[in-house]
From Swiss-Prot:
Signal peptide: 1-21
One GO MF term: toxin activity
Main location: secreted
UniProt-recorded name of the protein: Turripeptide UID-02
UniProtKB keywords: Neurotoxin, Secreted, Signal, Toxin
Species annotation: Gemmula speciosa (Splendid gem-turris)
Other remarks in the entry: The mature peptide contains only 1 cysteine.
GO cellular component: extracellular region
Tissues showing expression: Expressed by the venom duct.
Amino acid sequence: MGFYMLLTVALLLTSLMNVEATPVDQAERSALEKSGLGNRIQPRYDNCGDAEQTATSQSAWTKKPMMKNVKLPAIMWSQIAFKIKAKTKTKY
């Protein structure tokens, strides 16, 4: 039982050591938010529909992630690559 606990702790520690994230100071984060640097989502039906739909399409913003230099495990990269390949595959 003690061996498995030690093995679990060792695996958790090694997985935590592989994650590297560069912190962003609060001043830089607030400057990015105030400057409006984000990705605007452009719906295809921007000029169609009722006023409520237009109002929600005008406020559709996504923020860029603040973590830099994040290392993902290899299995996550393969899942991401699989999803991208599935989206770009064309049907004939």
